[in-house]
Amino acid sequence: MESRETLSSSRQRGGESDFLPVSSAKPPAAPGCAGEPLLSTPGPGKGIPVGGERMEPEEEDELGSGRDVDSNSNADSEKWVAGDGLEEQEFSIKEANFTEGSLKLKIQTTKRAKKPPKNLENYICPPEIKITIKQSGDQKVSRAGKNSKATKEEERSHSKKKLLTASDLAASDLKGFQPQAYERPQKHSTLHYDTGLPQDFTGDTLKPKHQQKSSSQNHMDWSTNSDSGPVTQNCFISPESGRETASTSKIPALEPVASFAKAQGKKGSAGNTWSQLSNNNKDLLLGGVAPSPSSHSSPAPPSSSAECNGLQPLVDQDGGGTKEPPEPPTVGSKKKSSKKDVISQTIPNPDLDWVKNAQKAFDNTEGKREGYSADSAQEASPARQNVSSASNPENDSSHVRITIPIKAPSLDPTNHKRKKRQSIKAVVEKIMPEKALASGITMSSEVVNRILSNSEGNKKDPRVPKLSKMIENESPSVGLETGGNAEKVIPGGVSKPRKPPMVMTPPTCTDHSPSRKLPEIQHPKFAAKRRWTCSKPKPSTMLREAVMATSDKLMLEPPSAYPITPSSPLYTNTDSLTVITPVKKKRGRPKKQPLLTVETIHEGTSTSPVSPISREFPGTKKRKRRRNLAKLAQLVPGEDKPMSEMKFHKKVGKLGVLDKKTIKTINKMKTLKRKNILNQILSCSSSVALKAKAPPETSPGAAAIESKLGKQINVSKRGTIYIGKKRGRKPRAELPPPSEEPKTAIKHPRPVSSQPDVPAVPSNFQSLVASSPAAMHPLSTQLGGSNGNLSPASTETNFSELKTMPNLQPISALPTKTQKGIHSGTWKLSPPRLMANSPSHLCEIGSLKEITLSPVSESHSEETIPSDSGIGTDNNSTSDQAEKSSESRRRYSFDFCSLDNPEAIPSDTSTKNRHGHRQKHLIVDNFLAHESLKKPKHKRKRKSLQNRDDLQFLADLEELITKFQVFRISHRSYTFYHENPYPSIFRINFDHYYPVPYIQYDPLLYLRRTSDLKSKKKRGRPAKTNDTMTKVPFLQGFSYPIPSGSYYAPYGMPYTSMPMMNLGYYGQYPAPLYLSHTLGAASPFMRPTVPPPQFHTNSHVKMSGAAKHKAKHGVHLQGPVSMGLGDMQPSLNPPKVGSASLSSGRLHKRKHKHKHKHKEDRILGTHDNLSGLFAGKATGFSSHILSERLSSADKELPLVSEKNKHKEKQKHQHSEAGHKASKNNFEVDTLSTLSLSDAQHWTQAKEKGDLSSEPVDSCTKRYSGSGGDGGSTRSENLDVFSEMNPSNDKWDSDVSGSKRRSYEGFGTYREKDIQAFKMNRKERSSYDSSMSPGMPSPHLKVDQTAVHSKNEGSVPTMMTRKKPAAVDSVTIPPAPVLSLLAASAATSDAVGSSLKKRFKRREIEAIQCEVRKMCNYTKILSTKKNLDHVNKILKAKRLQRQSKTGNNFVKKRRGRPRKQPTQFDEDSRDQMPVLEKCIDLPSKRGQKPSLSPLVLEPAASQDTIMATIEAVIHMAREAPPLPPPPPPPLPPPPPPPLPPPPPLPKTPRGGKRKHKPQAPAQPPQQSPPQQPLPQEEEVKAKRQRKSRGSESEVLP
């Protein structure tokens, strides 16, 4: 063998150029390489001889093709550098998971991903992982250690290698020596086949050299089979002793020797098994596997293994198959050894670095190609399969070496991992392999045919270069995927082949192998079963292979026995640690292996889900995508060998560069794949996606995560494998795109999207790869279009199918660390605490949180809820958190992320409902929104989220999330939804995100889970959010359940919240939706959702939990809640949570919004249109106004405030008009004022929806009553304004501020709803007329005059007037409530009269303007969808901000406690937060109780403030129906309101209390909320008047 290897080395050197063309002829020879002397026919003959002769032609091939193969190997090495860890880890994960079990997989994954060649060298015991790592690790080490050299060599040899890859593959296949010769050769770059090194491999030197170079390789062989290396050598040497040794001698100089030595080392490991098999089989194996060392010894065996798996008895067929059974260990060891050999070879030679890179890329390419190669080899012909499979695997040795170890476990996963990874490329690859297998031309064959002029050589070689480019990253995923398949096949199929080591001649093996491998590839579970069975049933070979497999997987004995260089204890002891070291080079992905480990632990099948996330890492995913797409493009034509050859030749010409045509093809493939994914998502082919996608998911995801997250996962090898590095994972930034893929793929929400995609795409693998990477990463930067859709479906499918919730977790988060990272990242998108029920989880699934998110998504996959425990743990703890927040987090992710998988276990019903509505849209949007939202959270919580989104979400996610995440769509850029927050967040399913079923289920699951998970994970105070989450069930109902969930959803799950907001803003569910948000924010309060007063009281009482949650969630609603909640309160009252929700939201607003207010106020000083800044600026401005007001800047601040607030008012009037319109439904029932406003909006909304008649009547009556009421209120308001002339402007500003706050979460609302706001302004003027007493003035009263007037009557605080106003507000808002309740008519009138007296002229005129604006707004209500959209966006932005901030209530409280005293004093009396406006109006009405409505009516004459308001709101202030009819609702006794509407008084109290923190300057409610409420209170006062007018008329 040595001589043959030397010969091959020499020949490779000499024949490098020779075999470039020969590679074309070589594949044809490969079919005939069964026993023909390969040497005799350099071209076709090379691949022909399987036995002794095979070596010489192989040698020639390696000489001629060796460099090319090494170039290819290097290309693959590069890929492996990118995807080595992936494949390695994936293999480890897959194999361990499938063959050994979750724990084993865990170790193996960690080791593989973690430890590259060093690991392989050091660990003989964990041969499988080491084998995989050997391939990956070696490649990785090549890439990392000798990156430049390996890369250079790869590039150098890439063209040659491409051509020669097939030749080398064939030759290598024929020459068993190549792996040995190639592995030993130190000159991975100089001579691909280093004769000296391979000589070491040859004979007994193989072991020493394996030890020296690839300890893992050799000690794999040694551990599992002491004579494995020797037997392989003997096998190689026996049949091809002279030639192979000669080749080996020749090879060392050649770079292919390194690759082939690697493969040979693997073959040595597997070669022992081969030795156990038969000489012919060994020849084949050596030809198929030993040649692999140049490319990837393991890949060659996978090819063989695939063949043998297909033809497990025919392990002999390619030797690769024979080697496959030992490959799981042997191939793994070989992989590691090969990699280490390559590394060792590479280390000596500067080229070796390059070669290593090249080999890594080559490994990647080969890994993919190995899938193809194995398929191709199987397809091609027995001889050709031997040569081709061996040759392809050899060519793909770097790539396929891992592929082989992974193939046995991953043949099952191949369908999953490969699908996932080949989603773009591997989808076609998978399809093509299946087709090719069926047609007899495997992917490898196609590749070889394409690449090599000859059937296999041409296909393979060009493909190797192109795949090297394309699959460099893809290859790791695909390679892992293929490797996973190979490994599955190896244990299953190769084990069987090993069982029949004597399985007859390579040709026979080859013949059967195609058949059996075909089924295995086609049936990944069969492959897995075979792998399991074969791994177990391999008695003689299994001794070595079992030892190797156990060692490889568990790294049991040999690892500790041979932990030479890396860190023998760690590498030996912990496969995880082994994975860690490789992480350096390509260990970014390897993280996913630890995730897989966690997954494995959590779920029996950690294999399938893990791969998707690991595979679908951002870099890997993108590259994978390109490669896969290129490969797909090639594969589709690849079925036709000539076409494939031509295509691949083209690409071979551009080794590292994809032809424009190829890129176009890839893009086309991506587009088609995306379409397929979307179609599949739509079709919701969850069973296909589940079955086909679940295993492949694991491989790609695991590989990607392993590579990306492997290091951090490895930080805590034992115990906290994932946690250790998961939180501070670097890949987080990188992971988010892949996190999205993995997130999506991993998270069931992503699988939801991906699932429909799965059927269209290769139902199994493409769904994850194409869906998650292609569909999910659009947002994740991987899939522009279906970022969060694809992966989730895949993962969801996986979980549904395998119930691999843990698997999906591992997919998103391989280890706990990664899981946490994924969850963290995914949940970062939707901050676990605040945005727990936001798609943010999904967004970040692909990264650190990808694991958690992936499980969340997987949870979304309904089927995977159980496995969500592992996911949940990712964010907080490995398993503990997952199980803790598995329900809330998982479910939340479940719900929030599109749960495409109908098989989602607990949330299936809701998920299915949502799935229909929100599956793909929600996935994409959720991922987008969550990703966006969580990205800010990532900044805040980079630790947890960094790892996750590197999911996303791929992973979160992100496949996560891909996975969130998916999901880093909504939450990450959540704050940036200024004008288009809705589009950003709800880009796809904006309207579809409001399906009641989806939100119904989602809110509960999402909110609770998000609150639990996010709060626990991300926040120090998760309980309160959790409470809200728990009560989020209300979110389920768009109007009422959603109120809790909806409000919570905005920040928690923007989509849900947005839909609710949109519903609230839209005519359909204007108030309920927004109320949902409010309630959702006050979900804990929402328990007493039924009685608004109770709820308010509860809200107030529950301030700690509910108010804090509100402070968290309601902060975003704060602006909208101040205004919107007031408007929403009437509707909220019907939901029976409006008051509490508002108060809670108000309080929350004070906390969260205060921070944002000041922050954003400074940032946004004049940018009122910024949705995220809406609340911040309005609140900040209101706070400034409030502070200045409180600071006796009565007119000074109003002047300043008037200017600023004038802008704000104009903007807010627009946004508030829309906000109010949507909220009016809430307001209608909450307060007469709010009810009036809400009634009008509700009317408009009902005009759209069903409630149009009564709300319209209410609005009409309100407008009618608002005429007189408006006169009174105007007078009152004008009085207040006259008191503070700028107060009129301030009132405008307050209205604007209220509106702005209301739309703070709806940044776009303001701009979009300017027209609607005009209408709303008029409407509000009408409402103000109705609520004339307090509405304009309270908002102006936010100005010190109005506020002080109110305070004067109420409480002697800083704002004396505001205090009386607050008292009046407490008394009067109940009057509007009574109006709403029918008891408030007199009260409203009386209160309105008094308030109107106070705010007579200016307020009345302002109210008139508001009425006009409301009238316009009524018109615009038809256009309410725009405003609804904006409001939803604004609310979502607010919630997103809250979620990002996380310390919403704390911030709130910090922000406004000083103003709270006034408000808190009145807060108890204060009505619901909705009453903030309503209270403002009633308070302002009651502020001057002596002022009768008549006086207020005259006060309305005051045009100063009215002129100002009209000037401010001139747009909105078109001629409105401002008939100031005496406010009938106002006449009702003002005192009764508080007692008569106990719900409202309670609500006002809660609201006031909430508002107290928010606007202390306002009346009770307005005091704390005064900062946010100056305008908001204006709006609320107006709304109260409106609501009072409308509701007093509607209700009375």
Swiss-Prot record:
Q: What is this protein called?
A: SET-binding protein
User: What PANTHER family has UniProt attached to this entry?
Assistant: HISTONE-LYSINE N-METHYLTRANSFERASE ASH1 (PTHR46147), SET-BINDING PROTEIN (PTHR46147:SF2)
Swiss-Prot/TrEMBL sequence repeat ranges? 1520-1527, 1528-1535, 1536-1543
Annotated GO MF terms? DNA binding; histone H3K4 methyltransferase activity
- Name the species this protein comes from: Homo sapiens (Human)
Comp. bias regions, Basic and acidic residues:
64-81, 363-372
Q: What is the effect of changing residue 908 to N?
A: In myeloid malignancies
What GO terms describe the biological role, i.e. biological process, of this protein?
A: regulation of DNA-templated transcription
Q: DNA-binding region spans which residues?
A: 584-596, 1016-1028, 1451-1463
Q: What is its main location?
A: nucleus
Regions of compositional bias (Pro residues) in chain numbering:
1520-1546, 1560-1572
What changing residue 868 to N does, per the record, is:
In SGMFS, ACML, JMML and MDS; also found in other myeloid malignancies; somatic mutation
Q: Cite the record's tissue specificity text.
A: Expressed in numerous tissues. Expressed at low levels in myeloid and monocytic cells as well as in CD34+ cells; expression levels are higher in myeloid malignancies.
Q: From start to end residue, where is composition biased (Polar residues)?
A: 1-12, 213-236, 270-282, 375-395, 779-796, 854-880
